[in-house]
Amino acid sequence: MKIYLVGGAVRDALLGQPAGDRDWVVVGADQARMEAQGFKPVGKDFPVFLHPRSGEEYALARTERKSGRGYRGFVVDADPLVTLEEDLLRRDFTINAIARDEDTGEFFDPYNGARDLQARVLRHVGPAFVEDPVRVLRAARFMARLAPLGFTIAPETAALMREMAASGELDSLVPERVWQELRRALTCAQPSAFLRTLHDTDGLRAILPEIDALYGVPQRAQFHPEVDTGIHQEMVSDMAARIAPGDALVGFAALTHDLGKALTPPEQWPRHIMHEQRGVAPLQALCERLKVPQDYRQLAVIACREHLNVHRLPELRDRTVHELLVRCDAFRRPERIAQLALVCEADKRGRLGSEEAAYPQGAELKRLHAAASAINARDLAADGLQGPQIGEALTKARIAAITAARKTSA
């Protein structure tokens, strides 16, 4: 019985990056032997155990044979005779197929993952790559993390990803897994690499058609020197990752704020009048399909519908600013204002030549919200107002607070 550290922990250590969870593989053991040593079985689809002291996951070395469509269509063999090399062969990328002996610290790298780490190449291990459509998503997500380090996808790996897209294999991806990989990509330093990887290998159309439809749609160069809406979307996603690092909530709202531009009739290009309203329907469809959590949906819809209003904040009347805050449910969910401000800043700075531009609207929105929020309904009730009178007086007082706050900054 031999134990090896495998996967991301080994990869990240060799890259000099902070490692997350550690995964272990056990060669030469079966379930009875693992349980006899105090390991607790937890795996449903294949034999995984929790260490009795550390709680870390230990999996028996195994092989996988394709038996059906999709990422669940596999027959697993975890016989004690399965070798370390056979276990590493089933893994997705060479940089994830490196093992380190727990006792000696010796590395085992039968598929030249260390060489690819040094060359900054994401390469599949073997032809079985095409059997699991999740690997297309993982390739894109790894690029969102590794592209800032100079990684590229091996041409032969990109070719296999195109074959998988053409075969329809990506249609078998379950929504929860698509959302999981998308959400993780949005926490990475360069989410645009997730989009670009899928787009360049023909997978984005099957996985995120609402985003794919933005590529090739022109915008007015006066406001968008990058012109292509798809390129703008990539820039916005990267800017969101820069100003709100690790915040997938802000990242998702930034990613989806301009979906309505794909629905603009071509004869109206490059203008996109009312795109902020048209974008709500495809956004809601995307959220339904991927089973996106409610907090993500709600912020994304607000950002889609209101981002132009925030950009035009200095032009809005005081009453209109209050109406904007009400539509955002900002008096019950005050955190949304800071989140919306970040999304709108990412939109404004996610344009060619505007990357370092100031965005005073964000701070002003938060300041006006704070002024309006200082008005308390309980104080009005204490003055003897009742029922609808309180609501009317509260609105009037909050608008007055916005007016006063604007005068102090004038």
UniProtKB/Swiss-Prot annotation:
The catalytic activity of this protein is classed by the Enzyme Commission as: 2.7.7.72, 3.1.3.-, 3.1.4.-
Question: What reactions does this protein catalyze?
Answer: a tRNA precursor + 2 CTP + ATP = a tRNA with a 3' CCA end + 3 diphosphate; a tRNA with a 3' CCA end + 2 CTP + ATP = a tRNA with a 3' CCACCA end + 3 diphosphate
Cofactor binding mode and count? Magnesium is required for nucleotidyltransferase activity. Nickel for phosphatase activity.
Where on this chain does CTP bind?
G8, R11, R91, R138, R141
Superkingdom is: Bacteria
Which residues does the record give as Mg(2+) binding sites? D21, D23
In alphabetical order, the GO MF annotations are: ATP binding; CCA tRNA nucleotidyltransferase activity; cyclic-nucleotide phosphodiesterase activity; magnesium ion binding; phosphatase activity; tRNA binding
Q: Which UniProt keywords apply?
A: ATP-binding, Hydrolase, Magnesium, Metal-binding, Multifunctional enzyme, Nickel, Nucleotide-binding, Nucleotidyltransferase, RNA repair, RNA-binding, Transferase, tRNA processing
Domain HD stretches: 229-347
Biological processes per GO annotation: RNA repair; tRNA 3'-terminal CCA addition
Question: Domain notes, please?
Answer: Comprises two domains: an N-terminal domain containing the nucleotidyltransferase activity and a C-terminal HD domain associated with both phosphodiesterase and phosphatase activities.
HAMAP family for this protein: CCA_bact_type1 (MF_01261)
Name-wise, this protein is Multifunctional CCA protein
Organism per entry: Xanthomonas oryzae pv. oryzae (strain MAFF 311018)
Taxonomically, what lineage is the organism?
Answer: Bacteria, Pseudomonadati, Pseudomonadota, Gammaproteobacteria, Lysobacterales
